[in-house]
Regions:
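Glycine/proline-enriched, intrinsically flexible loops and inter-domain linkers
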Residues: 1-229
Length: 229
């Protein structure tokens, strides 16, 4: 997501896995989940996995390491930054992608926990509900929008960012604060698939299929129309 948000077309990925003792039953359980997760999401995107490695050592019995590398191509003068442009006072924040639910809430802290199978239901809310086919559509539509922005010399007028580990809170703050701004976020306008959740969930839940633009008001409707169509 970070590579795509720079205005690049993602062309390949690779991965590096570190698991515990290969004879350990817990290691086998974690190994199966990781490999299934990477394949189950990566394959529908149509992005080739060009390599990787895997090592087993008892030091990783309690906490595995999953390192992913993504490759993309973009011309230097077409790079989109993950912060608001200069003179961005009054710019709009646009949230695109999957409607918000209760999945992916607390995902950052969950990523550092020791995994225990008996607690998987307890931790389920921290795990994102994947929709790789929606992600593929978002990638393709974003690539088309990049070309429009390039053609009209608007690349330097916008910022683009994935929602990170803190959802809307993370994206809005990082887009604005990096350039010395603050941001007003109206959570009532966030598109939702589940109602009556605590406001902190709408603010902080993370999913792979959500991104945020910052742009001047005169092109806001064009970006909205582009994705909605």
């Amino acid at each position: 997501r970070d590579v795509m948000c720079m205005g690049a077309e993602v062309i390949a990925c690779t991965d590096s896995f570190r698991f515990g003792d290969i004879k350990n039953q817990k290691t086998k359980w974690i190994h199966h989940g990781v490999v299934s997760g990477v394949a189950g999401y990566g394959n529908p995107l149509g992005i080739p996995n060009i390599g990787g490695d895997v090592y087993y050592n008892e030091r990783y019995n309690d906490n595995c390491l999953v390192t992913l590398v993504t490759l993309g191509i973009v011309r230097e003068d077409n790079i989109i930054h993950s912060y608001a442009p200069e003179n961005a006072d009054g710019h709009d924040l646009i949230l695109i992608g999957k409607p918000t639910d209760n999945s992916g809430f607390g995902g950052a802290s969950f990523a550092s926990l020791e995994l225990v199978e008996d607690e998987k239901e307890k931790n389920k809310g921290a795990v994102q509900e994947p929709n790789a086919f929606l992600e593929r559509h978002l990638l393709k539509s974003s690539y088309d929008l990049f070309k429009i922005l390039q053609k009209e010399n608007l690349i330097d007028k916008v910022g683009f960012k994935d929602l990170g580990a803190g959802g809307v809170a993370c994206a809005s703050v990082e887009l604005a604060e990096t350039s010395g701004y603050g941001a007003k976020v109206d959570l009532d306008k966030v598109h939702k698939s589940m109602k009556d959740l605590h406001s902190s969930v709408y603010l902080c839940s993370e999913t792979q299929e959500r991104f945020m633009w910052v742009c001047p008001p005169d092109i806001t409707q064009r970006i909205l129309d582009h994705y909605n169509k």
